[in-house]
């Protein structure tokens, strides 16, 4: 019978994480459980940064971006001895189960605690990249999408004024959901996705044809890590004789007030994670599919499940050019 649970956020922060923490804390307290917050992720767990939460610990945070518990990269968690110490610290506080909010790396940590130490963990997908298997949306994705679209709108204003080609690099690592969605919503003339081999020559030829037809400015949305966008801008400008500039949105996409969707999603997932633990279901991760909350075996989600590439969305963007 679970009496005490803990919650931590790990990896990159995402708008809506605070709503998820709040959902965990308040629903667990309402069920008569004790709740502990672990500050600075797995790093904080290893250094025993554990504090008991009350309902007032999570007051006035639902509208705040980031995570008030903090987060930190902690590659040392790959060491079995480090994980053993973390499990020991959890048990020293009498904690029976753990909720982990984060991306794939955070899930891996929860998976190892479950596998190696029999510690019940539930993962909640929190990352702007929307690259976690087993869910249609991750917490933070919709807010980051809105941020990217607003940036594209602003770039279009200045690009049209100066007849300029603008390249905007959007986060996502190896998942192009953000770039594709922002590109469609922002009316980008070209979208470069990481799931499709980048053909630089083809892109430049497309731009040249557009200029011949009278196009005076353009926006190119590209997922990060595909190429050096500043170097690409220089090459395009040299080839097509049209001023070209690159903008890297970077970490601005992680910040800001979470949108209503992410606040609601985080709240729902936080409560659902507690429900699973109270039912004795540790070793799972939470998701939302077709607007319904679901859960999957966390080991299966990491090892066997893959996110589907939005190829039809990319095809749609080309028809809208």
UniProtKB/Swiss-Prot annotation:
It catalyses: beta-D-fructose 6-phosphate + ATP = beta-D-fructose 1,6-bisphosphate + ADP + H(+). Its cofactor is Mg(2+). PANTHER family: ATP-DEPENDENT 6-PHOSPHOFRUCTOKINASE, PHOSPHOFRUCTOKINASE. Coiled coil: none annotated. Its EC number is 2.7.1.11. Keywords: Allosteric enzyme, ATP-binding, Cytoplasm, Glycolysis, Kinase, Magnesium, Metal-binding, Nucleotide-binding, Transferase. NCBIfam families: PFKA_ATP (TIGR02482), PRK03202.1 (NF002872). One of its GO terms (molecular function) is AMP binding. It is found in: Cytoplasm. The active site is at 129 (proton acceptor). Belongs to the phosphofructokinase type A (PFKA) family. ATP-dependent PFK group I subfamily. Prokaryotic clade 'B1' sub-subfamily. This is ATP-dependent 6-phosphofructokinase.
């Amino acid at each position: 019978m679970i009496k005490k649970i803990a919650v931590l956020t790990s990896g990159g922060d995402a708008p809506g994480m605070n709503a998820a923490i709040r959902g965990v804390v308040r629903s667990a307290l309402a069920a008569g459980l004790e709740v502990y917050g672990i500050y600075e992720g797995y790093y904080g767990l290893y250094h025993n940064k554990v504090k008991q939460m009350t309902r007032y610990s999570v007051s006035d945070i639902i509208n705040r971006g980031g995570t008030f518990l903090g987060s930190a990269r902690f590659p040392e968690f790959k060491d079995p001895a480090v994980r053993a110490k973390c499990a020991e610290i959890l048990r020293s506080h009498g904690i029976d189960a753990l909720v982990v909010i984060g991306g794939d790396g955070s899930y891996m940590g929860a998976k190892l605690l479950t596998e190696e130490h029999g510690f019940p963990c539930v993962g909640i997908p929190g990352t702007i990249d929307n690259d976690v298997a087993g869910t249609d949306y991750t917490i933070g994705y919709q807010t980051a999408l809105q941020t990217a679209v607003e940036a594209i709108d602003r770039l279009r204003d200045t690009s049209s004024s100066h007849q300029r080609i603008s390249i905007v690099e959007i986060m996502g690592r190896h998942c192009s959901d953000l770039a594709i969605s922002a590109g469609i919503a922002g009316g980008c003339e070209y979208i470069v996705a990481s799931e499709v081999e980048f053909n630089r020559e083809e892109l430049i030829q497309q731009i040249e044809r557009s200029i011949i037809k009278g196009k005076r400015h353009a926006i190119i949305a590209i997922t990060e890590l595909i190429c050096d966008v500043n170097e690409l801008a220089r090459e395009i400008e040299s080839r097509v004789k049209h001023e070209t500039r690159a903008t890297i949105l970077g970490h601005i996409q992680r910040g800001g007030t979470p949108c209503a969707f992410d606040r609601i999603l985080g709240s729902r997932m936080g409560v659902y994670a507690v429900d699973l633990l109270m039912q004795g279901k540790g070793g799972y991760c939470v998701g939302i599919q077709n607007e319904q909350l679901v859960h999957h075996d966390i080991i299966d989600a990491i090892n066997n499940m893959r996110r589907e590439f939005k190829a039809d969305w990319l095809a749609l963007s080309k028809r809208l050019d």
